[in-house]
Structures are given as structure tokens and as C-alpha cells.
Amino acid sequence: VNPSGRLPVSFPVSAAQLPRPKLDGDPAAPESLDPSKGQPPFDVHYIEGAEVGYRWYEKTAAKPQFAFGYGLSYTRFTYGGLKVSGGTSLSATFTVTNSGKRSGIETPQLYVAGEGRTRRLVGFARVSLKPGERRTITLKADPRVLATFDGAAHRWRPARGRYAVTVGPAASEAALTGASAIR
């Protein structure tokens, strides 16, 4: 049996990599946060906004101990042939090859980043491959995931512009990179 699970979270090297190694307003260690022991309530302000998890590590250029999407395998996979298509939506077509000696399952992930923004997971696939087998994969970004909210118009709008595209087995592993635009 070949392992194929992937981490749904990122693990830091140390607490110093976290957005908030110590909670503001907490005068004591975290284990004393039991309200029955008289710990007064306090507010926590989440200044990182939506930049949490793998996005926090990218924004701060920190390398986690184990990134979102990390997994183990007894075989190896190689990626190639990236073709990115833009227009009214965004998609990436590429190949994944089992270059090892055992059958295995790979989970390629598609990340995109608009200009001045951090990467965001917009698609993934789970692919079972025998040794030497190659498969062509196409992942499409849901346009709703790339939309931005126009507060003045009170509606979502397509996020036009240029996008950097990354494909790989985990958030911290870019096997392929490209770019395209949404108009």
C-alpha cells in the first residue's frame, strides 16, 4: 500500500512563524485560559485577514515545517507540459507522470495569484498512476473564486487582470509556473 493522504493544514517550524505567537491581552500562558479560573475575557484582533494558513506563510515568505497539501509516497511523480488558458476563465493543462517503481496516487494542486495578491488554491485532482504511466490533467478555476466584491455596486465582479499560475503537489512546492489573463 502506498500512502496518498495530504495535509489539510500547514505546520509551523516554531510558534514564531504564526501570525500571533502570543494572544494580545493574555497576560498568562495559554493553558490558563480557563474562564472558571478567573481569566478575564479579552478581544483578539485578527489583523492577518484572509491571509491564513498557507497564504500566511507565502505573505511572510516563511517556510513551514510541513505545508498545506504535503504528503508522503513510496514513489515519485514528475510534472510537465504546462499550458495556461485565460480569457473569460482560467485553466491549466499539464501532465503528471509516475516516475517511480510503485503505483501511487498524486494530488496536483492549482494555485493562482492576481497582481499584488497572495496565491490561492483554486483546484486540485486526485490521480492514480501505475509506474511509468502519464496522465494529462486540466484544472479550471471557478470564476466565482476569482471574483472581487464591488462595494459601490453591491455585487461581485470578474477579477480581470493578469494571474500567476502555480501547479504542484503542495502549497510550498511549485512544480510548474505560468501566467495568463482574465478579460
Regions found by a protein language model. Give the residues of each.
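Composition- and surface-driven signal marking solvent-exposed, interaction-prone regions
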Residues: E106-Y111, R119-A125, G151-P158, G178-A179
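Secreted, periplasmic, or luminal enzymes acting at the cell surface/secretory milieu
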Residues: V1-S91, V96-I105, Y111, R160, ...
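Intrinsic-disorder/low-complexity, polar/charged segments enriched in Ser/Thr/Lys/Arg/Asp/Glu/Gln
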Residues: S89-T93, R134-T138, A175-T177
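Intrinsically disordered, low-complexity Pro/Gly/Ser/Thr-rich segments with frequent PxxP/GP/PP motifs
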Residues: R117-G151
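Terminal connector regions
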Residues: D142-R183
